[in-house]
Amino acid sequence: MFEDKRERPRTLHELCEALNVSMHNIQVVCVYCKKELCRADVYNVAFTEIKIVYRDNNPYAVCKQCLLFYSKIREYRRYSRSVYGTTLEAITKKSLYDLSIRCHRCQRPLGPEEKQKLVDEKKRFHEIAGRWTGQCANCWQRTRQRNETQV
C-alpha cells in the first residue's frame, strides 16, 4: 500500500488524509492481535497520538486491550529507574513541561497539569525502555478507585 517509507503516514490523521477516508470510517488492524480496531480503539489511537506502524507496507495500529497488555510487558521487561520530578529535571537539564512524557499504562501524552499533579503528590516518573513515563489522570483515578474499594 505505502511502499515509499518516506511518504508513509505516521499518525492516524495523516493516514486518513492519505486514504481520503474520515476517521469515522477508516479500517485499521491491530499489529498484535490482527483484529480490526473498533471505533473506540480508532479514536483512542488518535487521542493518544500513537504512531502507525507498517508490516509488508500495510498500516497497523494497536487496540486498547493489546496496548494495555504490551505496556505492562514493556514495563516489566524494560524498567530502569524511578525518580521524583525535581530529580528528573536535574538529570535531563530540562523543565518537566519541555519533556515528552507518556502514561506508562495507556501511553497517552501527559499534559502540564498531570505532570504538576505528579510532582505535588510526590509521585515518581519512571524510565522504561529509555523513555520517561508517569501516570495520567485517567489511569490514576482508576487505581485510586480500585484501591479504595478493596478495603
UniProtKB/Swiss-Prot annotation:
The keyword Ligase does not apply. GO terms for molecular function: DNA binding; PDZ domain binding; zinc ion binding. Keywords: Activator, DNA-binding, Early protein, Host cytoplasm, Host nucleus, Host-virus interaction, Inhibition of host innate immune response by virus, Inhibition of host IRF3 by virus, Inhibition of host RLR pathway by virus, Metal-binding, Modulation of host cell apoptosis by virus, Oncogene, Transcription, Transcription regulation, Viral immunoevasion, Zinc, Zinc-finger. A zinc finger (unnamed) spans 30-66, 103-139. Pfam families: E6. Transmembrane segments: none annotated. It is found in: Host cytoplasm; Host nucleus. InterPro entries: E6 (IPR001334), E6_sf (IPR038575). It comes from the Viruses. The keyword Transcription applies. One of its GO terms (biological process) is DNA-templated transcription. Plays a major role in the induction and maintenance of cellular transformation. Acts mainly as an oncoprotein by stimulating the destruction of many host cell key regulatory proteins. E6 associates with host UBE3A/E6-AP ubiquitin-protein ligase, and inactivates tumor suppressors TP53 and TP73 by targeting them to the 26S proteasome for degradation. In turn, DNA damage and chromosomal instabilities increase and lead to cell proliferation and cancer development. Belongs to the papillomaviridae E6 protein family. Belongs to the high risk human alphapapillomavirus family. The cancer-causing human papillomavirus E6 protein has a unique carboxy terminal PDZ domain containing substrate. This is Protein E6. It comes from Human papillomavirus 51.
